[in-house]
UniProtKB/Swiss-Prot annotation:
It is found in: Secreted; Target cell membrane. Heterodimer of A and B chains; disulfide-linked. Interacts with CSTX-1 (AC P81694), and with CSTX-9 (AC P58604). It comes from the Eukaryota. The modification Threonine amide is found at residue 116. This is Toxin CSTX-8. One of its GO terms (biological process) is killing of cells of another organism. It comes from Cupiennius salei. The keyword Membrane applies. The presence of a 'disulfide through disulfide knot' structurally defines this protein as a knottin. Its main location: secreted. GO terms for cellular component: extracellular region; membrane; other organism cell membrane.
Amino acid sequence: MKVLVICAVLFLAIFSNSSAETEDDFLEDESFQADDVIPFLASEQVRSDCTLRNHDCTDDRHSCCRSKMFKDVCKCFYPSQRSETDRAKKELCTCQQPKHLKYIEKGLQKAKDYATG
């Protein structure tokens, strides 16, 4: 049953894509204004108050910066200490990118590079 549903969704996606207007018709449309979008995207900058990757985010755990596609996550851990009392006192948090999101970004970048050139 699951396979049938997946095949039906895939068929509908392919059919709708093939029956849609061609890309040339879309680009000739007057409502398409890519010239207005490109300067906006180029002027977008990284927030100045965000915490960079591998920097301390112990005080503000929601301040991590975004990578190209995904927001980094504040991960906390307890560094190895000699005594048990020192371990309980010191929590260290850093902004990190989860590995699965890192692999997704790399894969999409390689697919984009392959498609463009």
